[in-house]
Amino acid sequence: MEYRQLLQQYWGYNDFRGIQKDIIHSIGEGRDTLGLMPTGGGKSITFQVPALAKEGVCIVVTPLIALMKDQVDHLLQRGIKAAAIYSGMTRQEIIKTLENAVFGGLKLLYVSPERLFSELFLSKFRHMHVSFITVDEAHCISQWGYDFRPSYLHIAELRKIKPEVPILALTATATTDVVDDIQERLNFRAKNVFRMSFQRENLCYVVRIASDKETELIHILQAVQGSAIVYVRSRKRTKEIAQLLKDNDIKATFYHAGLEHFTKDIRQQDWQRDNTRVMVATNAFGMGIDKPDVRVVIHMDSPDSLEAYFQEAGRAGRDGKKAYAVLLYNSADARKLHKRIGDNFPEKDEIRKVYDSLAYYYQIGVGSGGGHTFSFNIAEFCSAYHLSLTLTDASLRIIERLGYILYENDPNNSARLMFLLSRNQLYLLDNLSQREDLVIDALMRLYGGLFNDYVYIDEQLIAQRTGLTPQQLYLILKNLNARHILHFIPQRKMPYINFLRSRVDGEQLVIGKAVYEDRKKEFEKRIQAVIAYAENDKICRSRQLLRYFGETDSEDCGRCDVCLDRGQKSASEQKMETCRQAILDFLSDHQRHHLTDLDTLQLPERHLDEALEYLVHEELIQLEGSYLWVE
């Protein structure tokens, strides 16, 4: 079936947007392809449509579990066979999903990068008929990117197993260097890049110089109505700012990675359903969240890079209507940004000291410790050896990048359990309390595979089903564990250190140029770019951002604080206004007109399409099928 027919049949759209069609044809022809599309540009269509058109299963690599689940649900609702593999599934569920892919029962299989290299996945992958591999958030593979993830580096190894399978890499943020690095790391057979302009014509970028950021924040949220996200750097600040907003009669809540899964889900749902207007969050919030009507994104603190800022700011106005991205800035921010360089890259002697102290802490001698995992309390560790918490955390991350340890500082793994008795033995038990009976019954109804393997459980859900409090449920599970009826592994919240190699003496710790000096230099460049953006009040904000991402021929936007201060509008904005006004004048008779009637206006097709989209979004005209009118 032709691509456009698939788009109409499954999504109900008449045509592709922007560079979607170019990317689809490229991967459809078997060419390695990199697509650069801003947030809201329709990335998912570029791999979902060709996945349906081509024989076999498309493997989609993404780090975003929430996005995986959301996209799989939407695909299944459309009658498209899709599945995902993520933490929380039993081994039997994973095997069933993989075998479904092997035997042709799936068109799309979503997998996190960490799970790609389990023996189980690789053994099944070898037998799959793979149409192509999609790498979402592809900037994560680049060490020059702002969100490098080491697990992404191994994706190219899949090509050794299936060298004929093409790769589609997608990202919403990438500089010229990162674009080249992505293609090199994924072993592209030939360079092949499709770029969609990162320009957002409905988004107004604003920098507010504010000595009192809290007062300015309240002023903005009172002036701009609608859904909002406020980004801050610390977990503590999320709670403080949310309370400040509530004290000023603005409905708000807060979100950060340290909250319980259940709490995060509830708060996210309340915000998405507009029960809560403002989400105050760290950068843990936003990726994979589909809420098109966010009217303003406000950064109380400057991010570490323009890539991060552009992606977070881009969560505003995805419905095409006017929206704002505001950065609150003052002279103290520049000092804080410069301080982050030293905080992220401690002196090499400090890194070696942390490594040796870690070995002393766990009593690991030189030449031993490889493969061992230890619970880790960074506050206790720093106190014991009189170390700075900030510099220690950064040192551990560098040591991890060097390949000596695995440092998991923010785990939130769900609880797991497995029955130690058979189903028949459970039924014969006569010494269970009523509550224990309720819990066992709920477990058997909610989860399969409990008699064969450890299964991740949702304690909040089980508590709801049984009418117990989470504390009561926890005590019952601990009691059943003590009586050897089941084995219960509570939710792990304690960070841990895994020694990937046997210990070496700190003086022999090899801190390579690529991991330290080169990355530090790149970090400094990104910090300086943020400062330059915030302090440059002479060049259009949109032009500054577009230039950073390699678009050097853009015009002034006419909407940002710089342009409005100058009282200027770009030539393109003036053309668009002329085009919109011509359409409104044509429809001023309040009659229904066919779209083809607009041909008499002789407007450029690109301007006509954009003008119509704007007028429909702003509800200035009505569009039904191929007819339009003004009420």
Question: Where is each model-derived feature located?
Answer:
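Helicase motor core with emphasis on the C-terminal RecA-like subdomain
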Residues: 1-10, 14-44, 50-54, 59, ...
